[in-house]
Amino acid sequence: MRDNLLFLKHALQEIKTVWSVTESSKYLVKKMIVPIPFCHNNLIVELGAGNGCITQALLKKLEGQSKMISFELHPAFFNKIMHLSNEQCTIVNDNALNILNFVDSQSVDAIVSWLPLANIGTKVKQAIITEVKKSMKEDWLFIQFQYSLYDYKFLKKNFKSVKVQFCALNVPPAFIY
């Protein structure tokens, strides 16, 4: 409940960067991580970690020498999830545009993004996707959640294959690309 109030407070103040009014449901989190092929040496990046609900779900699935880097730009949410840092997980208070300052080119196995693409200007959104693609291995996986299909064409233009799933058991319901 406290997390929902935190989301609502910051969404009302800064809707362009905090676009969710509640934390994501366990159903959405599960749908987001199911496609990730966890193995003993993954590098997973999370963009827009929020209150850490997916961060925690990803941490439970990491195996062996796998690592994860979670980006959260908003200070209140970053401070809330800092305690999740450990030898497998680094929490970063930085912009997704700076992903290559934290990972090598073509080194990331999967990126899970909670970024509010619909609220980000086209030039910045394109720059983020360009950096994401530079960071990914050849057989990479990019998972993005949104509350609408607004950016479907944008994602189709930037990625070879885009599949859409719907999660009705979330407030509001969400789409997963």
Language-model-detected regions and their locations in the chain:
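Conserved SAM-binding strand-loop segment of SAM-dependent methyltransferases
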Residues: E87-L97
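A short acidic, Gly/Pro-enriched loop at the edge of an enzyme's catalytic core
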Residues: N101-I111
